[in-house]
């Protein structure tokens, strides 16, 4: 599923940021990169989204974006878990409400 090279590459790239950078900013950047990557490579997008929530576990937007990416991969149960965490952090965030709608639509299609 995930190649060792991709994981190693992401670790090497992220290590300096995790040590010295603003974790919320890093989390947001990773989330945006994950969304962009989801158009080309869903596995890399999922890795980036996981890194975004690790970088800042209190970032509701990162959890919501990760949920969207997992939903794109047709992993409804993971998307729901990401949604639950995002809602727990900030239930009023637009990204959280958007993810809720996407999940509801996916359930209706099943």
Role assignments for model-derived ranges:
Residues 39, 72, 102-109:
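Register position in tetratricopeptide repeats
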Residues 24-35, 60, 64:
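Alpha-helical tetratricopeptide repeat
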Residues 62, 95-96:
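TPR alpha-solenoid repeat register
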Residues 51-54, 85-88:
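Conserved structural position within tetratricopeptide repeats
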